[in-house]
């Protein structure tokens, strides 16, 4: 991908400048939100596809490390969010002249993102478990939807220890997780003017993105389409089911981005690693890619 950043103005329907993907919640429709998520996916670099699903790069560095998107809420408040291209992990955001970084953000990122702003290190990481402990609620008890995202932006602009942590839980799921999964995108796009509590299907997909990505790549490598280990997910009604092969619906029509998986040295499932700028500063190797420890 030749350009480091993209600006796709959803409200205008066409690119207006190099910089970011943008979405104005005040004019949101089901179609415009889905277009925003699609263009966010498209702005991420990939190293080919596996089973027809874009595979994210194994590593990235320098200006290639991040993509950015802007969100403007009902109150005309705007935040700019930085996303790690290797795992769609949100690492920082800017509100006016202040930028906020998760406490576990690599030091090199501070030199690359939001230059010229006042930098604040948040007193928590972007891990779901940590954010939920700060908020005092599990994700299934925190509302999602466009109205919830609008309120979240306000709570990101006006920092508060607990309220901002809750806001980040909403942000992550309504953007990064929606980019990873069509089902989560559809859940949010069905709630343009109302909120909803995420069901167990949403939560289990969020928790198992790394596991699904790994098993899809292993199954593709063997040529048989069978997972080495089944991945346990939940239906919306809370019943459990196992995904065991690449013919499953979650593989063929739901997961939209794959976290790169590199097998152990000497494994028959080993997949070659692509490094965008070897030896450059700011190199980051993704790990499990999930916002929650499983």
From Swiss-Prot:
Entry keyword annotation includes Chaperone: no
Q: Which InterPro entries match?
A: Ribosome-inact_prot_sf, Ribosome_inactivat_1/2, Ribosome_inactivat_prot, Ribosome_inactivat_prot_sub1, Ribosome_inactivat_prot_sub2
EC identifiers of the protein = 3.2.2.22
Q: Which Pfam families did the record assign?
A: RIP (PF00161)
Signal sequence region: 1-19
Q: Which residues are glycosylated?
A: 70, 220
SUPFAM superfamilies associated with the record: Ribosome inactivating proteins (RIP)
GO molecular function terms noted in the UniProt entry: rRNA N-glycosylase activity; toxin activity
Q: Which domain of life is it from?
A: Eukaryota
Q: Where is the active site?
A: 177, 180
Q: What class of enzyme is it?
A: hydrolase
Q: Which residues form the propeptide?
A: 265-294
Entry's Gene Ontology BP terms: defense response; negative regulation of translation
> Can you tell me which family this protein belongs to?
Belongs to the ribosome-inactivating protein family. Type 1 RIP subfamily.
Q: What PANTHER family does the record tag this protein with?
A: PTHR33453, RIBOSOME-INACTIVATING PROTEIN
Q: What does this protein do?
A: Inhibits protein synthesis by depurinating 28S rRNA in ribosomes.
Query: What protein name applies here?
Result: Type I ribosome-inactivating protein trichoanguina
Q: Which organism is it from?
A: Trichosanthes anguina
Q: What is the lineage of its organism?
A: Eukaryota, Viridiplantae, Streptophyta, Embryophyta, Tracheophyta
């Amino acid at each position: 991908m030749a350009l480091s950043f993209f600006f796709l103005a959803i409200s205008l329907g066409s690119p207006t400048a190099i910089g970011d993907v943008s979405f104005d919640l005040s004019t949101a429709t089901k179609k415009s939100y889905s277009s925003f998520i699609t263009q966010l996916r498209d702005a991420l670099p990939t190293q080919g596809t596996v089973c027809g699903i874009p595979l994210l790069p194994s590593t990235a560095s320098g200006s290639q490390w991040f993509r950015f998107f802007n969100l403007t809420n009902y109150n005309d408040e705007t935040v700019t969010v930085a996303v790690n291209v290797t795992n769609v992990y949100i690492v920082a955001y800017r509100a006016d002249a202040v930028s906020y970084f998760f406490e576990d953000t690599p030091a090199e990122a501070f030199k690359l993102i939001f230059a010229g702003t006042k930098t604040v290190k948040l007193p928590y990481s972007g891990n779901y478990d940590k954010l939920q402990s700060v908020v005092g609620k599990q994700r299934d008890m925190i509302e999602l939807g466009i109205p919830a995202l609008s309120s979240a932006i306000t709570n990101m602009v006006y920092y508060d220890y607990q309220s901002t942590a809750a806001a980040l839980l909403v942000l992550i799921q309504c953007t990064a997780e929606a980019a990873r999964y069509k089902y989560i995108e559809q859940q949010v796009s069905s709630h343009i003017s109302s909120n909803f509590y995420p069901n167990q299907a949403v939560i289990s997909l969020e928790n198992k993105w790394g596991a699904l990505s790994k098993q899809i790549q292993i199954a593709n490598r063997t040529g048989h389409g069978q997972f080495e280990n089944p991945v346990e997910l939940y239906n919306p009604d809370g019943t459990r089911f196992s995904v065991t092969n690449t013919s499953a619906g979650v593989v063929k029509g739901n997961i939209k981005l794959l976290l790169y998986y590199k097998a152990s040295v000497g494994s028959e499932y080993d997949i070659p690693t692509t490094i965008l700028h070897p030896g450059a500063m700011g190199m980051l190797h993704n790990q499990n890619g999930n916002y929650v420890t499983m």
